């Protein structure tokens, strides 16, 4: 029998402790909040209920709305998906929004949580394309979606040198998804946004190999690709009417006799050469191919997402996504969307000086910072800037360290979070004017 969960602004009886978050009566639990908009309080209560082994619940009573239902679901979710939540009947619009958030958020979490033996580079590209097709079919027209998956040696033949070099050491071939969501029906319609995601389905570090503890969660290094796919899916569910292109740059970074090595120099299709000083700085190498392709489309904005640097995670932990850009108006639009959706983002510095901190005697740029004390997240962004012609405008880089938690918190279970899906969907629907 499922437990009924009530929501109340009344203070719990002191028998449950001072300012108790939860109280119980037979097969009913009550969450005590100061007001009905207290999302974090509801999410914490859901985590506590899960911690007590409760897996089957009904949200009962008249005080539940879209945001409290969503907060409860966020806290109740677990990677094992061994739970059931029955929601109250909401009005049509919030009910549809709740289901869309669950659908898109669960896609992101599942992709990140699944093992690398399941989510190979080609499989990640395939599942992402299939998901966007399903969203387009459910909320509009499946014919709005077209895509191409380039894999293996064909990447080399088409000069996607970053993805091919990073992925050539694995038996699972690297892949690039090129997806076009065009609901206008006009093949010449302008592109609102190009989304470029890092899809490293497992990262050993390559010859700059990671220690075992750091490697244990590296199936999640495709979090940026999953996040952007889920965001586009939610934007479609919310009624996106403008053209958006999605590029996922997918590979496994492994050690083998065929793997790329330190000292190698990659020549990209835009003519930029990059020396490999650290094979564990591979994410920027694959993203470069996607950014070159995105830039060719002349979109109004380019957004890339990647679990790119440990430096960003050291700065903001698992609690925020880091934002780096020289376009203040675009950053402001992102933060407005984040405020609306109540998701955590934090801006880190990116300036011209960082572009001079990745120099090398053997190529145009190096794939790591080459100054004694460098800002790792900033120099990684600087590397990417060499693949966006007008990098000072209309380009936003997100170092998304909040995609996954290795340990639980009072808000989140171990595993993928889905943080950022709503914000980026909101930004696609509310872009910078002009």
UniProtKB/Swiss-Prot annotation:
Catalytic activity: Release of an N-terminal amino acid, Xaa, from a peptide or arylamide. Xaa is preferably Glu or Asp but may be other amino acids, including Leu, Met, His, Cys and Gln
Entry keyword set: Aminopeptidase, Cytoplasm, Hydrolase, Manganese, Metal-binding, Protease
InterPro entries: Leucine_aapep/pepB, M17_PepB-like_N, Pept_M17_PepB, Peptidase_M17_C
Record-listed E.C. numbers: 3.4.11.23
Protein name (database record): Peptidase B
Gene Ontology BP annotations: proteolysis
SUPFAM superfamilies: Zn-dependent exopeptidases
